[in-house]
């Protein structure tokens, strides 16, 4: 698999998702990543530290330039805990948990986050404003209600299926209620 192509596809997808979700500075963005799926393998079976680092470093650069915080979801072997900067955990009142990821418990994305973040910690849950799922890792539990599916410009990064989610406030009220225009769907 060509690393330049993976980096280019990652950049394209993330920039497209950010444009479609209209995220503001200070927002939380969750990443679910299966490097095995990117390489054409089965999730959890062919993890690649190099691919994890390539993708996470690329995404951190894009989000960091916009003031958006990254949370990297781990696999079920760490109960889908997430790596965030300690400052983010404190700012959002997130409970820090004790686990250090490995390639096969947490995954390559979490290891990369521990490498590239300034002061990484693991937290059990978040309510992100949006997120990107590379390889069908199931990020929905970490995106706040109401989740809105986003169709990325590319359907795959490498060989991994790609989906994205945004969120919007709940529409409450009855027949007389009026709602502001939805910045995500714009209709």
UniProtKB/Swiss-Prot annotation:
SUPFAM superfamilies per record: TTHA0583/YokD-like (SSF110710)
Cited InterPro entries: Antibiotic_NAT-like (IPR028345), DUF436 (IPR006340)
Taxonomy, superkingdom: Bacteria
NCBIfam families for this protein: TIGR01440 family protein
HAMAP family (UniProt xref): UPF0340
Family note: Belongs to the UPF0340 family.
Descriptive protein name: UPF0340 protein SPT_0687
Organism: Streptococcus pneumoniae (strain Taiwan19F-14)
